[in-house]
Each structure stands twice: as structure tokens, then as C-alpha cells.
Amino acid sequence: MKIYSSIKKRCEHCRIIKRKGKRFVICKVNPSHKQRQG
């Protein structure tokens, strides 16, 4: 998982979700697209 100050969807399968006040990008098709907003 990469940590970025600004997160972006990298493909059409990426979803931006919020957990415990942090934003995440999750992608089931390509797990290397996972990101967290730091």
C-alpha cells in the first residue's frame, strides 16, 4: 500500500472509501493500486 497526500483512482475498478477518518483506494482487480491518504 502506498501513502500519498493526494490519492487518485488509477483504473475504472478503483474505489475511494473512508475508514476511521482516513481515505483509501481499494482495487480488487489490481491490488497494487491500493493507496492511503497520509
UniProtKB/Swiss-Prot annotation:
The keyword Ribosomal protein applies. Keywords: Ribonucleoprotein, Ribosomal protein. GO terms for molecular function: structural constituent of ribosome. It comes from the Bacteria. InterPro entries: Ribosomal_bL36, Ribosomal_bL36_sp. One of its GO terms (cellular component) is cytoplasm. PROSITE patterns: RIBOSOMAL_L36. It holds the Pfam family Ribosomal_L36. GO terms for biological process: translation. NCBIfam families: rpmJ_bact. HAMAP family: Ribosomal_bL36. Belongs to the bacterial ribosomal protein bL36 family. This is Large ribosomal subunit protein bL36. The gene is rpmJ.
